[in-house]
């Protein structure tokens, strides 16, 4: 039932939209505040699991007219929008303290100031699928985990520990002190061909920004570089790395 009274303003960064993203957030145990579903989807079989999970977790569900969904800037919402608390970032120390389930070498992904939420979301999705222990991104000049990133990640942001740090170069130094080899993904000839790199070790893969790639200081901090021609090949690198470790 819709509660009477004035409708609160929406904080778009704290929304999760799309059937799959909301469903995965529920399955992962995220404490969603409420879920809005388009009134014309009340009998949609595709929502059966989502509604059952919401009921089990006591998440309020309300059915809204399409005018409600017109208020948000996201067009791919599929008539499903959840309101969530601010994204629960992990700490780097917690991520490093967690044992690998299968005993294989640790694997992290570090993003050096990527600003496109669709690229960040795609890397979150691939990193989670490849079995990464976590993903690190900077607090400034970078896309954080917002509604668009969650949608592009197709639910993976609910499962992959994600850390925000003040300084990427400093974080790389901390990772190396923790015994992790830091590998920069780079398009320059200076990099080792991906298939020839020894990646069977505790590893952090650093991915540079869409326009300028790895920052010079970040590149210098890396133990070595692997040659990747373009950002779209990051998925291949992550999947290759997961097979190596």
Q: Where do the model's predicted regions map?
A:
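RNA substrate-binding interface of SAM-dependent RNA methyltransferases
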Residues: 27-30, 46-47, 52, 100-192
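Short amphipathic alpha-helix with an adjacent loop that forms part of the alpha/beta core around
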Residues: 95-100, 195-198
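Active-site/ligand-binding-proximal alpha/beta "capping" segment
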Residues: 183-235
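Short beta->alpha connector loops at strand-helix junctions that form conserved
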Residues: 65, 85, 112, 138-139, ...
């Amino acid at each position: 039932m819709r509660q009477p009274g004035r409708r609160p303003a929406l904080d778009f960064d704290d929304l999760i939209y799309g059937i799959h993203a909301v469903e995965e957030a529920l399955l992962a145990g995220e404490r969603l505040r409420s879920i809005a579903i388009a009134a014309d989807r009340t009998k949609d079989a595709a929502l059966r699991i989502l509604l059952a999970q919401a009921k089990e977790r006591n998440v309020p569900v309300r059915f809204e007219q399409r005018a409600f969904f017109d208020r948000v800037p996201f067009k791919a919402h599929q008539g499903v929008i959840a309101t969530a608390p601010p994204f629960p970032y992990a700490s780097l120390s917690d991520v490093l303290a967690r044992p690998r389930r299968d005993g294989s070498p640790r694997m992290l992904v570090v993003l050096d100031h990527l600003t496109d939420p669709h690229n960040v979301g795609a890397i979150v999705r691939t990193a989670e699928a490849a079995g990464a222990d976590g993903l690190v991104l900077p607090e400034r000049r970078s896309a954080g985990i917002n509604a668009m990133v969650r949608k592009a990640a197709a639910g993976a942001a609910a499962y992959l520990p994600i850390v925000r740090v003040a300084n990427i170069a400093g974080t790389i130094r901390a990772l190396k002190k923790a015994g992790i080899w830091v590998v920069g993904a780079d398009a320059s000839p200076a990099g080792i061909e991906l298939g020839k790199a020894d990646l069977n070790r505790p590893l952090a893969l650093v991915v540079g920004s869409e326009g300028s790639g790895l920052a010079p200081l970040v590149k210098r901090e890396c133990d070595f570089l692997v040659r990747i021609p373009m950002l779209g090949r990051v998925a291949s690198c992550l999947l290759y790395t997961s097979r190596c470790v």
